[in-house]
Amino acid sequence: MPRKTPLHMVRNIGIAAHIDAGKTTTTERILYYTGVSHKIGEVHEGAATMDWMEQEKERGITITSAATTCFWKDHQINIIDTPGHVDFTIEVERSMRVLDGAVAVFCAVGGVQPQSETVWRQANKYRVPRIAFVNKMDRIGADFYNVEKQIRERLKANAVPIQIPIGAEDNFKGVIDLVKMKALVWDDEAALGSKYEEQEIPEDLREKAEEYREKMIESVVETDEALMEKYFAGEELTEEEIKSAIKKATIAIEIVPMLCGTAFKNKGVQPLLDAVIDYLPAPDEVDWIKGIDPKTGEEISVNPSDDEPFAGLAFKIMTDPFVGKLTFTRFYSGTITSGSYVLNATKNKKERVGRLLRMHSNKREEVNEFYSGEIGAIVGLKNTLTGDTLCDEKRPIILERMEFPDPVISVAVEPKTKADQEKMAIALQKLAEEDPSFRVTTDEESGQTIISGMGELHLEIIVDRLKREFKVECNTGKPQVAYRETFKNQVEQEYKYAKQSGGRGQYGHVFIRLIPQEPGKGYEFVDLIKGGVIPREYIPAVDKGIQEAAQGGVLAGFPVVDFKVELFDGSYHDVDSSEMAFKLAGSMAFKEGVKKANPVILEPIMKVEIEVPEEYMGDVIGDINRRRGQVNSMEDVHGIKKINAFVPLSEMFGYSTDLRSMTQGRGTYSMVFDHYEEVPSNIADEIIKERQG
């Protein structure tokens, strides 16, 4: 069956934003105007089409990126809803991989918030072209031009308004389209903003519109020499020329076109859809995705064409109560049909494709075939996890793996009834398959099950899902911080492991140099053995011994990180040497060496942003200092003080309750992991004591 929508009319977009910038409402309206949902759902009432997990309905925040398909002016738009809460950055990162473009939603009052910065950095990392939608223009304190300034200053992006607002707050009537130079005015009486009229620009805004049109044209002609000459020669540019220049500059990530509106009041959504089609790229207009041939290690580029061999990336696994495991996949090239076989190149296993589903946020449509450039769900894959590549076995390819951050917080969980132990283990295993930033381990000493993740909320939601989806009630322990250890001085250490007790002995002898590395560098092992003083086959054993010892720590049992080991000398015995002996020698040399190298404990430091009314500022800052925090900057935003600080994670437990009581419920905060830093010695002593206790 030939494809219905040609490739150049497909858009794969994400809608990314800070919590409460109105992202779900915006998505909801897009689905409404494109005719998928007939009744608009409001997040406040918990009925939005995209937010379909129960907890999301309660908390009003979007947790899982559901992929939804809709149509606008004959174009197929696949929307990946990305979570805005900072504990779910992993989901945002994952959806960035598979997008071709994004709509960044900003709140007209709040502007650029810390999570917007995190999401923006991720979009830069994957080179995702984006357009900005300034939402909530009807709110008190809405200021489009302030948001433009913040995008330039805080996100260092070249924000170019292609619309300016007509009025603001209660008087927000519509927008001026700077490309057509027309006013678009919504009729408040019409059903849910479905009608708007093109009118002449109001006299009092004419001058401002002309000034912003000049700025817009100057920003975009820079990317096109022929247009630049025409423009500076004083000739008028046509609407088509301006549009194609905006598109070119957007795809090259040289500009971020800015639009505005209020999704809640249904104003500005249709022009946003037009902008998605006009300015964001089709799958064949972005750089080809690259992969590696698993056999030769050579790089291969994937041409987004139906005639090429099939290749796709599994970017999300979800368990559905009716059909079982859904594997959301971005199809990069070729076609895939239900009932066929594909190769999971990451695992090197064949998989049978069961059914293929196109998702409309909560309804699903079964299809026989998916084409290149599309996004959809596969039912029936057994071994595929997030980040795996599916491909044609005739052309195996591994598309780049995504890198997932290590968890910073963990808590012990146990089922309320012993009978649920196995049920809990199976459920946690399933959740870990869905979410690579969530880990499950067993504490060897206590036998407890430990779950680790990206923040308190992340783990709360996991425990919540155990209860709702898997019917396992759990008790949780006190949250534990993921401390690390490292050392500050370079040392050399010798260790000879020799055992002689009748029969065959054990002999391994090594000299290692331990060198501290800068934060984030990780572990490196360098083999400097000359002349075979340690035979080749024993060298990996030394490396393994050191890595295992590093995992167990030296001071308080936390993993030792960021160091380099040079193995530079040693000796062996023809009969008595073995891998085991060298592994033990490596491990003991490491432990003894680190003790002399000035070892320290590192703790995760969070970047915290707090917004409070001015009268509470003194208390809040005093409290940050008590928590060993450092205030980094303060600014005024519409009479609210915005405090940026770095605070150790261990001091932030239960902060939301404390902040509420300090500010009578008027303060809000958000935090994101930033870096690791050395713990002051008095606190390090306490941590060591507690661990040895």
From Swiss-Prot:
Single biological process term from Gene Ontology: ribosome disassembly
Occurrences of domain tr-type G (ranges): 8-284
Database matches in Gene3D superfamilies: 3.30.230.10, 3.30.70.240, Elongation Factor G (Translational Gtpase), domain 3, P-loop containing nucleotide triphosphate hydrolases, Translation factors
SMART domains: EFG_C, EFG_IV
A GO molecular-function descriptor: GTP binding
SUPFAM superfamilies noted in UniProt: EF-G C-terminal domain-like, P-loop containing nucleoside triphosphate hydrolases, Ribosomal protein S5 domain 2-like, Translation proteins
UniProt keyword annotation of Zinc-finger present: no
Chief location bin: cytoplasm
Residues that, per the record, bind GTP: 17-24, 81-85, 135-138
Listed GO CC annotations: cytoplasm
Key words of the record: Cytoplasm, Elongation factor, GTP-binding, Nucleotide-binding, Protein biosynthesis
Compartment(s) of residence: Cytoplasm
General function of this protein: Catalyzes the GTP-dependent ribosomal translocation step during translation elongation. During this step, the ribosome changes from the pre-translocational (PRE) to the post-translocational (POST) state as the newly formed A-site-bound peptidyl-tRNA and P-site-bound deacylated tRNA move to the P and E sites, respectively. Catalyzes the coordinated movement of the two tRNA molecules, the mRNA and conformational changes in the ribosome.
PANTHER family (UniProt xref): RIBOSOME-RELEASING FACTOR 2, MITOCHONDRIAL, TRANSLATION ELONGATION FACTOR G-RELATED
Similarity section: Belongs to the TRAFAC class translation factor GTPase superfamily. Classic translation factor GTPase family. EF-G/EF-2 subfamily.
Name of protein: Elongation factor G
Species assigned in the record: Nautilia profundicola (strain ATCC BAA-1463 / DSM 18972 / AmH)
GN (gene name): fusA
